[in-house]
């Protein structure tokens, strides 16, 4: 939840019956224009989702081609960002300019602002300490 309209404060919002409920497959953009305060603030999806220690924490699937990407991570969150502010600022394949929401970024991370949220893991790495996280992207065709 965003306390200052953009900063996470550690309050977790329920996703059931909201545009953030991806427990069942549906197109990412299917609900992106729904009347929801968080979508309006970000211009689309730019939100962290807490993940459980399961084999397939995030799955993208194209039912037309059968292409599938599965993501797993040892980090507690996956940030989903739907390129809400591209508006022709960079070019893609064959020089075609990318427009808003022409892509999606999936970023394994700690919860944003977790350094200030006591109940979340601290993200400070001190001199001499080591840290390891593993994120896997698996691609296949079904």
Where are these regions (language model features)?
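Catalytic His-Asp segment of secreted/periplasmic serine-dependent ester chemistry enzymes
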Residues: 12
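Short, small-residue-biased leader/transition segments that mark boundaries at the very start
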Residues: 3-4
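Active-site pocket scaffolds in enzymes
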Residues: 15, 20-142
């Amino acid at each position: 939840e965003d306390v200052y309209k953009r900063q996470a404060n550690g309050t977790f919002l329920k996703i059931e019956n909201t545009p953030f409920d991806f427990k069942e497959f549906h197109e990412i953009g299917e609900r992106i224009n729904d009347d929801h305060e968080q979508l309006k603030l970000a211009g689309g999806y730019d939100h962290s989702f807490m993940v459980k220690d399961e084999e397939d924490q995030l799955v993208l699937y194209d039912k037309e081609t059968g292409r599938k990407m599965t993501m797993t991570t040892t980090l507690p969150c996956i940030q989903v960002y739907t390129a809400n502010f591209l508006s022709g600022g960079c070019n893609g394949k064959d020089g075609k300019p990318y427009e808003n929401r022409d892509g999606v970024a999936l970023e394994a991370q700690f919860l944003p602002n977790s350094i200030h949220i006591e109940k979340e893991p601290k993200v400070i790495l001190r001199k001499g300490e080591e840290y390891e996280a593993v994120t896997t992207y698996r691609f296949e065709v079904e």
